[in-house]
Amino acid sequence: PVSVQELGCDFYCFSAHKLLGPFGVGVLWGRTAILDTMPPWQTGGAMVLSVRETESDYQPIPQRFEAGTQAVAEVIALGAAIDYLQGIGLPEIAKQEDALLQQAKQCLRKVPGLRLLGSEGPSVPVISFVLDGVHPHDVATALSAEGIAVRAGLHCAEPLFSALGVRGSVRISLSFVNTIEEIERLCTSLVQIGVLFR
């Protein structure tokens, strides 16, 4: 669990799709003292108290920031995703994902020419890597042909990749629904891709 009070943050947000929920919706928590001073960024129905020709009076928070029709189905789906994850248990999910992460790192380290990016400390089950001599997009395309989904590119972090001296990376995101067999298939495919492109 996260305590925004313990963190001392002004805002805290996350995307639903990071929790197996739908795209296009997320959660934003904001400190009341800050939200109260903010004007609405968008206008529409249900967020105003009254509208006149030259000015408007807005609802109090949070309604002030809820213009128009909300993404009702997506919000319900996010709730279902959270219920699903809580039903399994977040500690159990974290345990499974950490075991998969360690297995994946061990397997990937054996792939010739593959370099893991990032630190060796505790981390979420996301791994970025480069395969020497093979552009990340080529790796992703070849893996996709094998039915393996990854992301490739700069991952909204171009300054980081410039500092690392690489032109992007391949990123895998593991989840408790993945298997050891899938990790082994990924590593086998990467060995074959390395041979094919060199």
What are the roles of these predicted feature ranges?
Residues 1-198:
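Pyridoxal 5′-phosphate
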